[in-house]
C-alpha cells in the first residue's frame, strides 16, 4: 500500500526517504540531464574560439606535419599562412608572400596522408615526405590593406585560442591551421570543421573564399572581403581580457 505523506509541525508535507537504489537512479537521471544541458551549452559556443597549435607525441603525426610544411614551403611564408587538412581530399595551403604582395594557394592533387602515411612505410614517409604527390599552384597580388586586415584577423583568432575551445579533431572533416610568421616562430591555432554560424566557421569561410578568388584570379572580389574580415576580427576580439588593447600582431 502506498505510504501517506507525513505532516510536520509546520503543516508541510514530508515524503518518506528514498531507498538507496532509488537515490542512485535519481542521481543518474539528474547527471544525464546535466550532461545533456552542458553539451548543448558547450556546442553553442565552443567553436567561437580556436584551439592552440597542436603538439604531436606520435611519430607518424609529427612526420605528417613535417611533410606538409615541406611540401607547401610554409617556412618561406611570412606574415601568415592557413594550412587546410581534409581527411579524404588533397591538402592545401593559403599563404602570403610579403615581398611580392602575393596570396599563394597550393593544392595537392591527392591526400598526402593517404598517399604517404598509409601506402608507404613510416620510415619512407619521414625520409621523403610528400614528394610524390603533384600539386596545383595559384597566386594573386593583393593590396597592403587586405594583407594587413588578414594579418590582424589571424592574430586575433590565435591570441584568443583556448584549451577549452573548439574540438581538436575527429573522424572525417577538415582541420584548419592558422599561423602567424611561420617563417620565423609560427604562432598558431587550429579549428576542426566548425559550424558556419560560429566565429571559427566565419573565419574559415573567409579562407575558402580567398582560395576561390586566388584560383580564379578575382582580385576585386578578394579586396571586397576587407569589411567581412574586420567584422570577424572583432568577433574574436570580444574574448580579449578587459582593458587589453591589441596594438601589435607579433609578426615580422
Report residues per predicted region.
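Function-determining sites in protein domains
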Residues: 47-252
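Short, linear, compositionally biased motifs with a strong N-terminal bias
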Residues: 10, 37-38
